């Protein structure tokens, strides 16, 4: 059936152009689409492909640009050869199908009309609206940011927009913990995916954060990443009969991959496979663990360095400021731009030069006069500007307040553009971002039960007491006494029950170390005390966790308490609760902050009450006291926690193993003194200029407001409900702004993506979606809406229709033709030309004399006057009026051909204006800021040239048509 070299088109992806068969076997066929620089592999049984065969009388284009008027079609061994005359010279010519223009597009609604494949008029209307919405969404500046299941936080949106719209972004996201670096990275990634600049993404994280990333990417962005570990990769290891390695690269099997950097550091073979796979974007979380020194970079650093050199887009995430390790900070920046950050000493000197400028900015922000030193620092940096008049306005008491404000803002903008690392480094601090609650610590001291004391004593005599045994004695006891139940005597349970009863009207999150502990606790609360509770752990599926989360989120009939394992809660935030019980204490400061971070988020309305029940004179008590009095980690975020843990870890271990040891108070005082010293260093080293650039100011606030206006958009709601109806999905309104969408037996497609067998609950309301993770949040960016639009626009739904127009002013039987043409380019996705010329529907409405009335008669206005026709009558009209319809189609082609140059000109102007402005801005900045990469400017210039070239090649095709016949009644 398929022969290498034959030409086929994709029925589901018309925009790919004309394909060439490059390979075929018993099960699959491979098609190359040169126009779009894409390749597809189809299963033979369900390949959505149509053989391309032109007929006598057709005019066809060659790949060399000349046209042939076909006079004869010859087939030879599966290949087609076209014979005819060249349109330009009239000479006889031969055109084998291999030489056909790759940019041919096929979609002939007239063929369907005349072959009795006539659709309902309301489906034609839905198709046109889908095309209009598709065009609008391609051009929306909010695309890739509005669909996130998260609150609209201005600084996050600012960073996402600033970075997400760059070509090959390479940045360091260094917001303090709790400010949403993962969300920023996700929005940047989403924009890059939507624009087509990125397809294959690798996320490297510490092992403990793998599930958090997996869950956050799915629940917040609808991105289905795959988790790669040794077990998964082992399935790809193969050897032939002779024992030769014929393994496939496992990392080539998925486009979106999450892997543990710890695992890859310890597995050179897997690291080699990662390097052998081609990635478009690399994201590294907890990048401060990549240790570097000039003479001895760590294995992890060297691995990421090699990856970053062969990957165009790189995002590094770290919460550790450079003051805790200037060398490592320099090394992370070098991963992003080795040419710019090539010498550590030069970097240190340059950073020192910016310190006085940052101080001057603080003065500007506080609306105070600038000192002479501050004026000199600013003048040195803005050497090409005459700053003297600006200083006079700022320092003069006679200046109007509004004038001072304008000059201050202009100066700050100029300084931001010249900041040494402001283009590659973004950092927001809690001091700079308002809206965080206080944290209040409550330590509950309980007597350790004799059962635990005895178990620890016996295990100690056997020489096998571990740190985990002492921190979590319930697990040790259960291991030694499988028939008994630790929950029958543990005083923490009685305390928890009493606490819950005293706070019946409050939501409480309880975090345990292990899933088994969480399961046992929840069972006791539910069965013994009839307390409404839910459990949440890593052994549950994501759907089960969503349901538990939704039950906890319900205000009236929901669970009072959610009991979660520490791993189970990763990636979940419950800011509607303000009480946290740490049933088991995390064993390092980072994990402690992660646990508190489940509640301590922007949007938390109340102070967070942190309750820690622990046994007297135990390892738990020592650790809790050190966290509180040494690090102050319960009541404040502690960015230096990990560094202090490393610095004092060995000494802490002495007191953990022997809680009675002398000198603990002195140790606490020493830790706290060091913590205060580092905290002061951090505060002193705060770069106000960098924070200002990272914050986004009023523009970021305006961006958040613009997205908020799109939430619950009535156009989206109406379109989505019509879409679900046409697809054949059942809709049940649940009230409270949610709907259940369920599959039926009469759907257009057997399996619509995103719809579960038992139905899926959806909402258009962001706040409800934040409360209920089991509810899908529908926006224009959601896969359900995007897939629905693709289903309508790329298939045959609504391509041809015939309707009755009830109008007493027109003679009965008057024929009108409504033609929808698409103007589009067939260019590589990476150019992101849809910003300037998306697939654009152009409506032409012809009367029986060929006059275009589209401007006078609106689509919506006409739609109200139309009545449906039964299929038999529609077919009869199509046959009777075939000649007139063909004549009107010919006239409509002349009309669209006349409109095309204007559309191309406007798109070219938009592209040239946008890309030239960005090019000019970067070129100007490069003269005063070394951080502007030359390769970025070169790529942008190349993009501008190629974009204008491809837009000039835009063409039109007839997408759909509706024949309208008038009647008096």
UniProtKB/Swiss-Prot annotation:
Keywords of this entry: Activator, ATP-binding, DNA-binding, Helicase, Hydrolase, Nucleotide-binding, Transcription, Transcription regulation
Job of this protein: Transcription regulator that activates transcription by stimulating RNA polymerase (RNAP) recycling in case of stress conditions such as supercoiled DNA or high salt concentrations. Probably acts by releasing the RNAP, when it is trapped or immobilized on tightly supercoiled DNA. Does not activate transcription on linear DNA. Probably not involved in DNA repair.
InterPro entries given in the database record: Helicase_ATP-bd, Helicase_C-like, Helicase_RapA, P-loop_NTPase, RapA_C, SNF2-like_sf, SNF2/RAD54-like_C, SNF2_N
EC class of the enzyme, as a word: hydrolase
Protein name listed in UniProt: RNA polymerase-associated protein RapA
E.C. code: 3.6.4.-
Family from the record: Belongs to the SNF2/RAD54 helicase family. RapA subfamily.
